[in-house]
């Protein structure tokens, strides 16, 4: 990964495709989903996630919980993990950067729900730096103070919400060609090995 907007000299390669290259077949239209924000995940090593859960765990419109087990997690409000498809009953899915990138942004953008997140700071092969707030996802402040205002707006304007979903689906779709992705990865590796002197440079 690289810092978003500062990756000109970085080498980005998808080395964890089995975990990150996930897309869901969502058959539930946005208008038929619950007017709810959902988040499940571990808050370990993520102050942002902890702060979100502590702020909204008693809010009936925000379904959020820490999926860690054990006494150390009780203070944040724990719950069992749920399947990715179980998230799809909600119109909005929170997306957080953890130790680095926000890994669930990839599958959320393949669905009929909308990713909600502060502006991403890190960038991977998914090109998060090219994501546009209000176009590919709903951007909220780092302190989430405008979260409910934002979701109320898109609940009241489902046609604009659908536009974001369509744009997100289009963005995610460019990564679905596995042969093309493999070819790009090989070219990236080839160029890296050439630049580091591990392969002789070519004219192509």
Question: Predicted regions span which residues?
Answer:
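Nucleotide-sugar donor-binding catalytic core of glycosyltransferases
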Residues: 1-114, 118-139
């Amino acid at each position: 990964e690289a810092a978003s907007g500062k990756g000109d000299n970085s080498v980005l390669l998808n080395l964890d495709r089995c975990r990150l290259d996930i897309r869901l077949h969502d058959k539930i239209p946005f208008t038929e989903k619950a007017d709810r924000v959902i988040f499940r995940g571990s808050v370990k090593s993520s102050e942002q996630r902890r702060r979100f859960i502590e702020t909204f765990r008693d809010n009936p419109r925000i379904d959020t919980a820490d999926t860690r087990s054990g006494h150390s997690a009780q203070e944040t409000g724990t719950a069992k993990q749920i399947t990715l498809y179980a998230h799809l009953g909600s119109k909005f899915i929170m997306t957080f950067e953890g130790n680095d990138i926000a890994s669930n942004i990839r599958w959320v953008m393949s669905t009929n729900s909308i990713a909600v997140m502060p502006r991403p700071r890190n960038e991977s092969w998914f090109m998060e730096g090219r994501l546009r707030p209000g176009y590919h996802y709903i951007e909220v402040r780092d302190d989430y103070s405008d979260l409910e205002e934002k979701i109320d707006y898109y609940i009241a304007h489902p046609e604009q919400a659908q536009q974001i979903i369509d744009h997100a689906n289009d963005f995610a779709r460019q990564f679905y060609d596995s042969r093309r992705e493999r070819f790009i990865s090989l070219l990236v590796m080839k160029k890296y090995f050439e630049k580091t002197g591990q392969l002789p440079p070519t004219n192509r």
